Swiss-Prot record:
HEAT repeats lie at residues 95-132, 139-176, 178-213, 242-279, 281-317, 439-476, 618-655, 703-740, 785-823, 878-915. Regulatory subunit of the condensin complex, a complex required for conversion of interphase chromatin into mitotic-like condense chromosomes. The condensin complex probably introduces positive supercoils into relaxed DNA in the presence of type I topoisomerases and converts nicked DNA into positive knotted forms in the presence of type II topoisomerase. It comes from the Eukaryota. Its main location: nucleus. This is Condensin complex subunit 3. Belongs to the CND3 (condensin subunit 3) family. Residues 663-693, 909-1034 are annotated as: Disordered. GO terms for cellular component: condensed chromosome; condensin complex; cytoplasm; cytosol; nucleus. Residues 964-984 have a biased composition (Basic residues). Residues 909-949, 985-999 have a biased composition (Basic and acidic residues). Signal peptide: none annotated. Phosphorylated by cdk1. Its phosphorylation, as well as that of XCAP-D2 and XCAP-H subunits, activates the condensin complex and is required for chromosome condensation. The gene is ncapg.
Length: 1034
């Protein structure tokens, strides 16, 4: 321990600093006292550096060494931390700080990676322990700067990490040309070690130049790097420094990350930090995310916020609602309506507790229905002039977004009460029929209407009525009057006028004659005639109005009707079928929509035809040619829809719908699978089709199948990425479902996956990358399909011209993939017990194909790829009869030494394994005979019943071990094709063949244990029997 008032020696200080519970402050103080008492400071520093060299050569992160490094850094920097004379001394060239830095800078280029690592580590610790206001000589600063920049390029990752940490205080983020910042950016993008990238993320200062690189690390392949990148963004970067696109991208990627740790950082750090930057206002945060263009990302962010808050607190924070539990229409914004919807959906997912809380923020269905209807009625219908004004369009889009969110909130309402449900249905139907309802809202409205209606017949009837009302509304029109009727009315009016004149004249005469009773009667008559005259004049002037239904064929109306029809068909069960109503809709609405000039109408009509085809097989067969024609002629969007419709039909009904006449589904599926993999000439086999079909029908059907597959194959080469991706995805689904088995198409898909043209098509590559291993390892027949595609795929790559993108593909990598996909050891364990797995393995047949390909041209450069693939195969020693002669010929014919050695290794390993198998078969009868003799000897010598029982038990033990050995026969523990093989002559092969034939006659075909297992069992038996015999002798 340190004794007060007494200076310490340097060695003792280094020794004590290694201990875990030592107080480094006291050690520093004592060593400082010894330094101050030393007259010649240079001798002290030399001795100090001498003892420092010992921990510098230790590379492992030993705790004792780490403590020594900390102590050295604290001691040296203590000369900077003190004031007065020591500060002046610290500025001198021979000060401890400068002296140590100079020594470290001289040693940073040492050949020992331990020294380089510790030097960079100590420089880092020195710079970290220096105070904020510390000053370093410019020359020393430049030396440290240059040395650490050199160490950033060190071949050892740990050295680069320490150099990164050491340069953290030397960077200048305000300088766009700062060498440290540029080096950090370079390492962040290009360093292969994830720990180095993490170190850079820890140290780099965010700036206009480095921020995009930090954001880019959120897509790093390593989870710890992605996690740290999000942490840095949440702690060091203000939300305003990020663009809206960057914010949305960060949330979208982070909340959908495969790692739970990354999601946790997004939820608990990044979003919470952004919320603090928005002063706790969730609506302000949503405004910064642009909810109109990214509603799904905003919903995910809201759900992340809701998940860390109790239900009661969420309900209290919902302050935008009035006494009706509604947001006033005049205060509706995209942010508050989305927040309201997200909160309702979150509470509904919380079970009973959430349902109770939901009643506090949502009204009754009838009240909400009136509220929704009143808002949607305010949506304007823009005229042609207004459509040219972007402000008007943006305002309309905002209102449509609000309406969309209000519609989706209906799913959270409690529709169990009959009255509220009926009122809601009535309002939804009224909204769907309204002329000012935007097309963008029709799909959501129809989906919710069908969600409330549970019966399929009621759904069909309701949608049909809405379509009829929307397409044929009641219109009041002028009814032109008949000429004769109009003339009759004029005559009647003239007669009334004459009567009126006569009555007025008689009234005047009566008043003159003072006949007041007569005058009273005439006065009443004049009033009646005046009224009749007025009525006749009105009838003559006003046109007759009539209410009639007028069919509307404008694109907007047709699109609304088709959208509702499509939603209806999607919600119907496949067993429902097409009834009279749907057939009528199809004839009057869907099929005419195919020829419409507007692409959106045609696209929706194609989607409807695809849904109708899934309801009826005959309908699918009838309209398949129409869809195939659309595939080749229409626009990209319509093509995609038609393509998906065709694939859906093939998935549901199989290739049977390609036939002109219905046949047995099982037969049609089998024939379709055969046709998909063979040429027309190979398909014309009498035994592969139904006997009732004529040769002409067979040829027509096979031509149809091959024509469609040729069409799909052509789409795989399409320049349009969407068509290429949809085709590949559809073919993958057909193959995985067993509807289509084709090695040729499988080869095309493999080439498409490797083609550099598809490098940017993430969806396509992800789809194929998931499909290949799942399809290959699901069953043995699929592996056979890959084996059949092996040679065609490689030959296509070998023969690719230099101008083709396939010329840049690594053929060795393709061969390695195909070998790996056909490994028997990778097969699903559930299928390994099946009967077809017990047959000859896929690699045995593939090896024969490869050998034949090598023998075709042994001098070709492609032989190296084949030989390497041959070495990677898992070959069975039991089925090597056909393969060994081919290997012998290949060894003799191949001229390339590398290929010859590779083939020789395969042959040698195969022969040694076969010899082992033969010896084990010969040994088995001998072992059985020896075991039987020993058992008889034991029974003869034993005299007691107990010993006989023990002997029987040991005999049973031997049999059980032998049985277990037989059960394990044939199981392979891993690839054995790469073991060393020795060369053998053809005479030896012939002799081995004769021995094999003799064994097959006298030895049963039953599987046998290996020789080693049998010998071990025999040795155990010998020991047990000897023990028993000794006990008997005693």
């Amino acid at each position: 321990m340190v004794k007060e008032g007494k200076a310490m020696e340097i060695k003792e200080a280094f020794d004590l600093s290694q201990k875990a519970h030592q107080n480094h402050a006291k050690l520093v103080s004592s060593l400082r006292a010894a330094y101050n008492k030393t007259e010649d400071k240079s001798i002290f520093l030399e001795e100090f550096i001498h003892f420092l060299k010992f921990p510098l050569i230790v590379y492992r992160r030993e705790p004792a060494v780490e403590r020594v490094m900390d102590f050295v850094a604290k001691f040296v920097t203590s000369f900077h931390n003190s004031g007065g004379e020591n500060e002046e001394e610290a500025d001198e060239e021979n000060s401890p700080v400068n002296c140590l830095f100079n020594f470290l800078l001289q040693s940073h280029g040492a050949s020992s990676m331990a020294v380089r690592f510790r030097v960079c580590q100590l420089i880092n610790k020195l710079l970290v322990n220096l105070p904020e206001n510390a000053q370093i000589d410019d020359d020393l600063f430049d030396k440290i700067h240059d040395a650490m920049l050199i160490r950033l390029k060190d071949r050892v990752p740990n050295v680069r990490i320490q150099a990164v940490l050491a340069l953290a205080r030397l960077q200048d983020p305000s300088d766009p040309d700062c060498p440290v910042s540029n080096a950090y950016v370079h390492l962040l993008e290009n360093d292969s070690n994830p720990e180095v990238r993490r170190a850079v993320l820890t140290c780099i200062a965010p700036s206009a130049k480095s921020l995009p690189k930090i954001v880019g690390r959120t897509m790093d392949v390593k989870e710890p790097v992605r996690k740290l990148a999000y942490q840095v963004l949440s702690e060091k970067v203000h939300i305003r420094a990020l663009t809206i696109a960057q914010r949305v991208k960060l949330l979208q990627q982070g909340l959908n990350d495969r790692s739970a740790a990354v999601k946790d950082v997004i939820q608990k750090k990044l979003i919470q930090a952004w919320l603090q930057y928005s002063e706790g206002d969730v609506l302000d945060l949503l405004h910064r995310l642009d909810v109109e263009n990214s509603p799904e990302v905003s919903l995910s962010a809201l759900n992340a916020l809701f998940s860390v808050s109790p239900v009661g607190e969420l309900v209290q924070n919902c302050k935008n609602l009035d006494e009706r539990k509604l947001i006033p229409v005049e205060t509706l914004t995209p942010e508050n309506v989305l927040y309201w919807r997200a909160l309702c959906e979150h509470l509904k997912s919380k079970g009973d507790e959430g349902e109770a809380a939901l009643e506090n923020i949502l009204p009754e269905p009838a009240v909400y229905a009136r509220y929704l209807s009143s808002y949607l009625q305010t949506l304007p219908v823009l005229s042609e002039d207004q459509r040219a004004d972007m402000t008007k369009i943006e305002d309309l889009m905002t209102k449509e977004f609000i309406g969309q969110q209000l519609i989706l909130t209906i799913g959270c309402l409690d529709t169990s009460e009959e009255g509220g449900r009926k009122r809601l249905l009535a309002v939804l139907q009224e909204i769907l029929v309204m002329q000012n309802t935007p097309t963008s809202l029709i799909s959501s409205l129809a989906e919710l209407l069908l969600f409330v209606l549970k019966d399929d017949d009621k759904r069909i009837q309701t949608v049909a009525e809405i379509i009829s009302e929307l397409r044929e509304p009641i219109v009041t029109v002028d009814n032109p009057k008949d000429a004769a009727q109009s003339r009759k009315l004029q005559l009647k009016l003239a007669d009334v006028k004459v009567q009126l004149i006569e009555a007025k004249q008689a009234l005047e005469d009566s008043l003159t004659n003072e006949d007041y009773s007569r005058a009273s009667e005439l006065k009443e008559k004049v009033k009646e005639l005046e009224s009749l005259k007025t009525q006749l004049i009105k009838e003559a002037e006003e046109p007759e109005m009539k209410e009639i239904r007028v069919e509307k064929n404008d694109p907007e109306t047709l699109l609304k009707c088709l959208i509702m029809c499509n939603e209806l068909l999607k919600h119907l069960s496949l067993s429902k079928g097409l009834g009279g109503t749907l057939n009528e809709i199809c004839e009057s609405l869907i099929l005419p929509g195919i020829t419409n000039v507007h692409p959106s109408v045609r696209n929706m009509a194609v989607l409807c035809i695809g849904c109708c085809a899934l309801q009826n097989k005959d309908f699918a067969r009838q309209h398949l040619p129409l869809l195939l024609q659309i595939l080749q002629l229409d626009e990209v969007k319509v093509k995609n829809s038609a393509l998906n419709a065709v694939f859906d039909m093939l998935l549901l009904f199989g290739m049977d719908i390609l036939k002109s006449k219905p046949t047995n589904p099982d037969d049609s599926q089998c024939k379709a699978q055969e046709n998909a993999d063979e040429d027309i000439s190979e398909q014309e086999k009498p035994g592969s089709v139904d006997e009732n079909l004529t040769n002409e029908e067979v040829q027509e059907e096979t031509a149809t199948v091959n024509g469609i597959l040729h069409l799909f194959s052509g789409f795989l080469d399409s320049e349009i990425a969407e068509i290429r991706t949809e085709t590949a995805e559809g073919l993958v689904k057909l193959m995985f479902s067993g509807r289509l088995i084709s090695a040729k198409l499988l080869s095309r898909l493999i080439l498409l996956w490797y083609n550099p043209v598809t490098e940017e098509d993430t969806k396509l590559r992800h789809c194929l990358g998931v499909f290949f291993p799942i399809f290959a390892y699901s069953c043995r027949s699929n592996q056979e399909c890959f084996a059949e595609a092996f040679l065609p795929t490689l030959q296509t790559l070998f023969n690719a011209p230099a101008s083709s993108p396939l010329a840049d593909v690594d053929v060795a990598n393709v061969a390695e993939l195909l070998v790996d996909l056909t490994r028997p050891s990778g097969l699903n364990p559930q299928n390994k017990q099946s009967q077809d797995y017990q047959a000859a393995m896929v690699h045995d047949g593939l090896a024969i194909k490869i050998c034949n390909e090598i023998l075709k041209d042994p001098t070709a450069p492609d032989v190296r790829i084949y030989a390497k693939a041959l070495c990677s195969l898992e070959l069975s020693r039991e089925n090597s009869t056909d393969l060994l002669p081919l290997l012998d010929c290949a060894v003799e014919d191949v001229t390339d030494k590398v290929c010859e050695r590779a083939i020789e290794k395969v042959r040698s390993q195969l022969r040694s394994g076969r010899e082992e198998h033969r010896v084990s078969k010969e040994t088995e009868p001998q072992v059985s005979k020896e075991t039987e003799d020993r058992t008889n000897l034991q029974e003869n010598e034993e005299g007691k019943q107990k010993d006989e029982a023990n002997c029987d038990e040991n005999t049973d033990t031997v049999k059980e071990k032998a049985a277990r050995g037989k059960a394990t026969k044939g199981r392979r523990k891993g690839p054995a094709a790469a073991a060393t093989r020795r060369k053998a002559s053809k005479a030896e092969e012939a002799e081995a063949e004769m021995e094999r034939q003799e064994e097959s006659q006298c030895v049963p075909v039953n599987t046998r244990p290996s020789r080693r297992a049998k010998t071990a069992a025999l040795e155990k038996t010998k020991k047990n029997l000897s023990k028993l015999l000794n006990e008997e002798a005693n």
